[in-house]
């Protein structure tokens, strides 16, 4: 369409890092995304049927693998991961043990971001316990920013853990056209601010949307980068 031609002809500048959350449930979208050969960063939920397979596919494709660490949301009834979720009423030792176990289950990861976690990422004591493990293991932390008042990235910075914060979610809608519109919104954000971080999910519609626009995004002048290159 004419609209898309105009977008591609416009030269954007800046760096865009894209994190693919929820890897471990379904392998097909992960394979499809990895096959695009874009430097995406993949956040894997621990202990899922395909967590190890996803790690293998991601590392095999030369991409960045991360742990998608389940953390307590404001509404506990909405918690998707039950017993493996970091809770704010756990002791520091319990938090560290759960974090370490999840990290160890995915050898070769480079960093961590939070799954859910609006309550946990706004709790300083909980974040300090998680980040202590990450610091010991040389891992970075990306605050998924599921909650505007989360302080995960601030606490990480204060502890000397390399960190960054998500700026935009791309696939709150499962409609392909909506996802594509959000991808261009993220490109524009990266152009405006010099860089941006976007999160989407390992789902069929998301993989299909990226397949449609990846060439245009690459041609637009925006540079897709691993999230590790935008850490502060």
Which residue stretches match the model-derived regions?
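Active-site beta->alpha N-cap acidic-glycine motif
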Residues: 7-80
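Juxtamembrane proline-rich low-complexity "stalk" or linker regions positioned immediately after a signal peptide
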Residues: 1-2
């Amino acid at each position: 369409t004419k609209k898309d031609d105009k977008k591609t002809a416009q030269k954007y500048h800046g760096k865009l890092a894209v994190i693919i959350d929820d890897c471990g449930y379904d392998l097909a979208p992960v394979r499809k995304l990895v096959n695009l050969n874009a430097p995406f960063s993949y956040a894997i939920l621990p202990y899922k049927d395909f967590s190890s397979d996803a790690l293998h596919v991601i590392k095999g494709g030369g991409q960045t693998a991360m742990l998608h660490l389940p953390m307590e949301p404001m509404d506990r009834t909405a918690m998707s991961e039950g017993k493996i979720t970091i809770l704010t009423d756990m002791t520091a030792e319990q938090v560290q043990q759960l974090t370490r176990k999840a990290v160890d289950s995915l050898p070769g990861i480079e960093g961590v971001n939070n799954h859910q976690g609006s309550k946990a990422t706004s709790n300083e004591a909980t974040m300090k316990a998680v980040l202590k493990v990450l610091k010991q293991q040389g891992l970075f932390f990306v605050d998924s920013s599921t909650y505007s008042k989360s302080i995960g990235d601030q606490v990480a910075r204060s502890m000397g853990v390399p960190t960054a914060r998500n700026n935009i979610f791309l696939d709150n809608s499962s409609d392909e056209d909506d996802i594509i519109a959000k991808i261009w919104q993220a490109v524009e954000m990266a152009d405006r601010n010099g860089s941006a971080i976007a999160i989407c999910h390992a789902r069929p519609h998301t993989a299909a949307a990226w397949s449609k626009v990846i060439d245009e995004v690459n041609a637009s002048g925006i540079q897709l980068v691993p999230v590790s290159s935008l850490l502060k």
